Amino acid sequence: MSRIPIHSLLNPSESCKSISNVPSNYRDLSTFNKERAKVITTFQEMFYSMLENNDDYNKIESLIRNFQPKLTWSHKCESLTFKQKAYLTAIIQKSIKSLLVLLKEKGKMREIEFSRKEVRKINKYRQSSKNFESVNIKILTQDLMHSNNNEFKKGKRFLKSHIQLLENWYSMNRRNPYLAENDLAYISKNTTLTKTQIKNWLANRRRKDKITEVSSDIRNILN
């Protein structure tokens, strides 16, 4: 037989009010088990959907918003034990973390696939141009592929001092990391890099930041 909390005995009206605020379909343990199964099934469907390239942060955020009421209910429901409440919370949090890890890894895979596509474009261009010179794949973008032949130069690794200057500028302008013409001229003058190389480096840096970004809603529920 389940014990009735002393607080409920001393405050029956408050106890009734608390129960009435809980949806009727959440009031017994069998319903809790059904809800737990729904949580697991929903996250599994989301996981496989993301594997099929249907992934974005908006879907994850929407999923979190849908399950936030369940977390609130589980914390307040007196018919659940502490262990059951912790179990339901852990399922949701660990599932969200799994989705975020998958999203991050898929971002890395997209970068690899992007590089492979660029290599294929270069090989195709090389076959059609006798005067083609090798370029640095890491800083090559689609803009360079459409440039004139005389703009292609043999690529070299950026010097550490050049990278440091670019990183410093990016850190100071992270909220709006897009170069004004005077900034572009300054960096080009002090690094001997071409304007195209600088723009390409910043484009890659922005892409890297975007992949690792986690929305505030997701951070809040995981903390």
Swiss-Prot record:
CDD domains linked: homeodomain
A biological process from GO: regulation of DNA-templated transcription
GO molecular function, one term: DNA binding
Protein localization: Nucleus
Highest taxon in the source lineage: Eukaryota
Keyword terms, alphabetized: DNA-binding, Homeobox, Nucleus, Repressor, Transcription, Transcription regulation
The entry's DNA-binding region: 151-213
SUPFAM superfamilies: Homeodomain-like
PROSITE patterns named among the record's database cross-references: HOMEOBOX_2 (PS50071)
InterPro entries documented for this protein: HD, Homeodomain-like_sf, KN_HD
Xref: SMART domains: HOX (SM00389)
Gene Ontology CC annotations of this record: nucleus
Miscellaneous notes: There are three genetic loci for mating type genes in K.lactis. MAT is the expression locus that determines the mating type of the cell, whereas HML (containing HMLALPHA1, HMLALPHA2 and HMLALPHA3) and HMR (containing HMRA1 and HMRA2) represent silenced repositories of mating type information. The mating type is determined by the MAT locus, which contains either a copy of HML or of HMR. Diploid cells are usually heterozygous for the MAT locus.
Function according to Swiss-Prot or TrEMBL: Mating type proteins are sequence specific DNA-binding proteins that act as master switches in yeast differentiation by controlling gene expression in a cell type-specific fashion. Transcriptional corepressor that acts in conjunction with A1 to repress transcription of haploid-specific genes.
Family according to the record: Belongs to the TALE/M-ATYP homeobox family.
Subunit structure: Forms a heterodimer with A1.
Name this protein carries in UniProt: Mating-type protein ALPHA2
Organismal lineage: Eukaryota, Fungi, Dikarya, Ascomycota, Saccharomycotina
Gene: HMLALPHA2
